Each structure stands twice: as C-alpha cells, then as structure tokens.
Amino acid sequence: MENITNIHKPTIDELLELRKYKPDYIPNKDNVILRIGGKVVGASMNYIIFGGLPKAGKSSYLNSCIASAFVPYDIFTMKINLPENRRKICLFDTESSDYDYYNRIESIKRFAELENLPNWFNSFQVREDGTGTIRRMVERYLELNPDCSVLVLDGLLDLIINYNDEKESSMLTKWLKKITKVHDILIISVLHFNKSNDHTTGVIGSHSDRFAQSTLDIKKDKDNNTYVMSSRFMRSDSDFEPITLMNFSGNLQQVANDSVKPKSKKASDLDLIESQRLCKQIVSMPMQYSEIVDEIKERTAESNTYAKQLMKIWISKGMVSKDHTGKYKIF
C-alpha cells in the first residue's frame, strides 16, 4: 500500500505565496459560462443557486438551462457556453425516482430539440445514496473527467444531513468552494425555499446566499398559469429581466413580462423564529449599526430599506440593545 505520510503539505509561507495577488494575471473572459439575458450569472470556480418553493418550476428552468449547452442559441434567454477544450457537463440528480429522472432527461432533449444527447453529457441518479457517498462520487467523477467544466447538483439539501447545523453548513460551503477552485468548474445547484418566509432553507440557505455567485428566484403563479424566474442576488452583474413562462397544453413558452414586477418584501413578514435565528447569527459580537445593516443585506440579499426595517424590529423587540460604546449586541 502506498505510504501517504510522505505527501508534502504546504507551509503557511508557501500558502501565502500561492494565494498572493498576481498583478500580471488577467482573468480569462472565457471563464464566464452561464449568461441569462446577457448578464453574467455563472463563471468557473463558482457555484450558483436555482431556488424556489417545491413544485415551483425549478426543474423546467434548470432543464432548459442544461439544454442550452447543446445548441448554438439561448433558450429562454439562458445560455451555457462551455470552454472549447472542456466541453463536458454532468448532472447528479439526488431527488428523482426512475420515472421522474428519465422524464427529466427527455425534457432536456425536447428543450434542445435533439433525439439523443451528446456523449459529453453525463448524468447520474443517486437518490438512494447517502450524503458522504454522493460527495465522494462527485469528487471521483471530477478526478476522472478533467474536461468537465459544469457540474449540476440537484439538489443541495441531499449533500448535508442537518441543514440547520452551523458547522455542517459551513463545511458544505467550504467543500463547494474548494472543488470549484481545484477542478475549475461552475456548479449549478438547486435549493428549496421555506414556505413560511420565502427564504432559502435553513442555515445552509444563509450560507449559500452569502457565498454563491448568483441566487435565482423561481415562483409559480397558479392564477395566471405561469412561472417566473428572477435574480434574487447577482454578485458579478446587474439583474436580468425576469423570465416568464406560460404552460400551453403542456408546452412551456416564454411570454412578455412587462407587467411582472418582483414584489418588494417587508421585514415584518419574516417569521419570528427565523428573525431570531438570523439575529443570533449576525450579531455574534458587539457591532456598529451600519455593520449590522450591511450584514443583513449580505445574508438576505435584500435591500437597504429591508435591512433597516429588520434592525428596527430587532431593537423594538429587545433582541439587540446598544452598549456603552455605542455598539449593538444580543440582549
């Protein structure tokens, strides 16, 4: 058996040199892999989130997004452009039964208008496998397929045991950041929203909002028989125009969305338990008012007005109080 004790681990000095800013380095523009409405949504060494309530239409948008990698044109303004020498794309489906999984593959074919998908598309159904096993399979696949530039993980909650555990959520986000950097890939993942507050689920949701390059918000309008996808958070570009799809006898078609405007959220709509959890996460030490407001915006991907409203609620309910230095702390 190979002696792994001889593997060299970089010293702190070596790590500092490796991580140091390189003034002559210019990022390759080809690193941008996913654009929606012409806006930069996903680039290599990043991960993005397709979010929404269960049965809100996430799979339809994601399937059409995947299909855009196989055709020279965009689909519903979404376009995946794979690097010339790394044209492999892979889907790990952690949720679907056999029936839904194979229907999903057929859906991707229909969106791409192809009878057969190219051999540089790989897909795995891992519904019956455990969290650790799925992660190891992902890592092994990436080791064996260095020409893979896009990895789709549907869904993220199956890669974690307790999505409300701070340590476990932190470890998962670190794992995502590590494999995207080491393997130079874009990860496209799916995360459910809570029905109570329309936020990404649990602590892992807070972490994903904070570290993802983009978080997309998908909603279903039963009254109008439409689905709407908008940008909740965009790190690398401005928001794209919402994409509205209407179901015409089982066929999704894009329709004009001039009348579709994202509704502004109110901090008062946030569930009390969720508000308390968020407060404890953010105000872990005495902080200035402006620091807390900035952190709320970062964690929730909401507006400055929303953050100030939430801070006002925390103060009025006695959840935080000002100390003798003028900083706020948990009461």
Task: Cite the ranges covered by each PLM segment.
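The Walker A/P-loop phosphate-binding site
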Residues: 2-108
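C-terminal regions of RecA-like/P-loop NTPase motor modules
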Residues: 3-12, 26, 144-147, 221-331
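Conserved catalytic network of the ASCE P-loop NTPase/AAA+ motor domain
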Residues: 42, 81-84, 143-145, 178-183, ...
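Short, solvent-exposed loop/turn segments at secondary-structure junctions
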Residues: 43, 159-163, 193-200
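Phosphate-binding/switch region of NTP-binding enzymes
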Residues: 49-50, 60, 90, 170-254
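Conserved inter-motif catalytic segment of the P-loop NTP-binding fold
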Residues: 53, 83-171
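Generic structural signal for well-ordered alpha-helices
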Residues: 138-139, 173-176, 311
